[in-house]
Amino acid sequence: MKRKGLLKISLKAARINANLTQQEVADKIKVSKHTIINWEKGKTRVGYAHLKVLSEIYDIGMEQIFLG
C-alpha cells in the first residue's frame, strides 16, 4: 500500500514539475483526463507502456516515477 501512495505522489509531482495540466497529459497520450486523475490518485494502475510514455513526457527516468 505504501508503494501505491508513492506512485500517486510521484506522478502528480512529475506532471506539475513539467508544467502540464492533467488535460494536456491526457491529450498527449490519448487517454481521458479521468484516467490521469485515477492514476494520480492511485485508483487504477498505470501500465508499462503508459509509464514509459509518461517518463518521456515528464523528462524523467521510469525508475524515478517509482522511487519519487
Please place each PLM-identified region on the residue numbering.
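Alpha-helical residues within the helix-turn-helix
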Residues: 16, 27, 56
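Short alpha-helical DNA-recognition segment
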Residues: 19-38
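A short, Lys/Arg-rich alpha-helix, primarily the initiator
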Residues: 1-17
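DNA major-groove recognition helix of helix-turn-helix/homeodomain DNA-binding modules
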Residues: 49-64
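Residues in the recognition helix of alpha-helical DNA-binding motifs
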Residues: 14, 28, 39, 68
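K/E-rich alpha-helical interaction surfaces of small helical-bundle regulatory domains
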Residues: 35-37, 41, 60-61
